[in-house]
Amino acid sequence: MTPPASRRASFLPFAVTAATALLVSATATPAAAQTPTQPLSAADNVEVLGIDEGLPAAFGAAPAKESLADSVIEDVLGLRATELSTLDAQDRDVRVDIREATDGAAFGVAIVTAPEVEGEDPYAWLFAAELDGAVWSVGLEGTEEFSEILADSSLLDTEERETVAASADPNRISAMAYTGVGLPFSIGTSMVMTGGPHGFSGGPPYSSVDFAGGNGQARAARGGYAYSLCDGWTRVIHDNGYSTDYYHLENYQWLPGNNVGTGHYLGTQGNSVCAGGSSTGAHIHFALRGYTDPNAAGWYVALNGLTLGGWTFVEGASYGGYAYRNGVGTVYPGGWMYNYGF
C-alpha cells in the first residue's frame, strides 16, 4: 500500500538531501487546497424552487435553502436506492420545491422527473423537515418521520397539519376494509377506461388506470387535502390511509393544500407532462397510493382485487386486465365505466 502524500517524507531514506525533501514537500497537496465535495443541490440535474422566506438567514457555510435541498435530495436518493449520477444517465432530474417554512421547519414537494418517452414515469413526495442542531432532518410522505415532523411543527393550518400528519402516518391509522375511494370523475357519470391497471413508476405495482371521454373533467375521488405537485399533477390525501394521484391534467386548478370534497374539480383530461413521462391522447392518469398498507410503504398500491367506484379491478398485462361489478358486468379497456361512488 502507498502511504498518503502527507506521510511520504517519513519513509524516505535518512540521507535524503534538502533539495529532494523540498521537492517532496512541494508535491504534497495541502488539505486546504483540496477541492470540496460539491453539494447535491449544485448538480446539473437538480433544480431548487420555492421560497426563501422563513428559512434561517444563514446556515453554517451553505445557504439555508441549499442546505435544506441537500438533505431532501439525500433522503430521496436513499429511499429510491440510487445516485444523482444514475438519474442523470437516465435523463431524470430532481426538483425540490420549498412551499412553506417557519420556526425552523419546512414543507414542500420533491419530484424525480422522467424522460418524455413512453414507459417512463415520474415520482414525487411531499416532505417535511426540521432543524436538528446544525442539520436538517427530513421526512418524506408516507414515512414515520414525515408525520412526526409535520405534527410537531407549526407548518400549515392546524386542521390541515393534524389531518395530513395522521392520514399519512403508517402507524396511526388502519386502512379501511374497502378503499372508500371512487373514480376520478363525477359520481353518477361515465368515462371510458382507456387503459387497465398499469404502473405509475416504471412497472409494478399496477396502481393506475386511464380514463377519457365523458365531459372530460377530472374530479376528486374522495375528499381530502389536495396538493398540486406541478402544473398538471394533483395528489389528494384522504382520511382513510390512502391518497390518489391525477396526472396529465389541463385547464388545471392549482391547489396548495386545499380541503376539497368528493367530486371537487381538479382540471380536464389532457396531455400535460409537467414532470415527464408520456401521454398519447388526452386522458386522466389516475393512481392509488397507500400509507398503512405494509406492502405499499407510502408508495403506489396494486389495484388488483381492490374496489374503486363500485368496480373491482383485476390486473393482466400492463394496460390490460378488466374491472367487474356483480350484477352489472365486466368492463375491459375501451369500455365505458359508471362511477357508483363508494
Model-derived regions: residue spans:
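Short beta-strand edge/turn micro-motifs at domain boundaries
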Residues: 124-168
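Zn2+-dependent peptidoglycan hydrolase active-site motif and core
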Residues: 220-253, 274-283
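Surface-exposed, glycine-biased beta-strand/turn segments
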Residues: 149-233, 317-342
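Short, well-structured beta-strand-loop connectors
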Residues: 217-228, 254-270
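Short, non-transmembrane alpha-helical segments in secretory-pathway proteins
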Residues: 52-95
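Conserved, short, structured surface segments that act as functional micro-motifs
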Residues: 203-210, 258-342
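Secretory targeting and sorting signals
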Residues: 1-34
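Exposed beta-strand-loop-beta-strand "reactive/processing" segments of non-cytosolic proteins
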Residues: 93-131
